[in-house]
């Protein structure tokens, strides 16, 4: 698996040995970032990114490659955090990232450096975690007004977002769906 575009284009990302972590495919990442660049006034440039269920870090690393200013990568799994550390170290992104161990559905208050302008959520498919994680982001004031939130979930899954997140785009790519929300002015 490789970084699709930007200053790290073509660099190889380490992938998980187990099937417990499902990285976002190169094709799907390219589609996500094309949407963000062309339909949402290049929401990536200079963004402060939070990546929930970060896994390999593919989404946050792609954002950093394309000009994001900082990424907080959140995952509760020890295998995922080891993979995140390996990818960040191999790509020299230590100064632009922080890895945080947390349950994405029970985040609490936003850490120093928040609120964030761009969020990625790629929970395990079919486990109903997207809705609680979105609610946790909103309840903890993790998102600035106008922040974009990109959710990858199974194509047929329902994504229950809190009222503060307004749906602005949704697309299906094979077995996956991408839903994009914008944070309203009040959290």
Where are these regions (language model features)?
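Class I S-adenosyl-L-methionine-dependent methyltransferase catalytic core
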Residues: 1-187
């Amino acid at each position: 698996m490789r970084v699709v575009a930007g200053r790290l284009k073509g660099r190889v990302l380490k992938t998980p040995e187990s099937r417990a972590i499902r990285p976002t495919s190169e094709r799907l990442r390219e589609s996500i970032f094309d949407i963000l660049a062309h339909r949402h006034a290049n929401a990536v440039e200079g963004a402060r990114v939070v990546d929930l269920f970060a896994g390999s870090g593919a989404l946050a690393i792609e954002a950093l490659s394309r000009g994001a200013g900082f990424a907080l990568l959140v995952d509760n799994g020890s295998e995922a955090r080891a993979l995140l550390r390996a990818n960040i170290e191999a790509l020299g992104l230590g100064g632009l990232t922080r890895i945080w161990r947390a349950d994405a559905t029970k985040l609490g208050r936003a850490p120093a450096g928040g609120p964030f302008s761009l969020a990625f959520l790629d929970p395990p498919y079919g486990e109903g975690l997207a809705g609680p994680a979105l609610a946790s982001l909103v309840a903890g004031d993790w998102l600035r007004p106008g922040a974009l939130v990109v959710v990858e979930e199974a194509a047929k899954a329902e994504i229950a977002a809190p009222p503060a997140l307004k749906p602005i785009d949704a697309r299906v790519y094979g077995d996956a769906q991408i839903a994009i929300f914008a944070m309203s002015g009040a959290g």
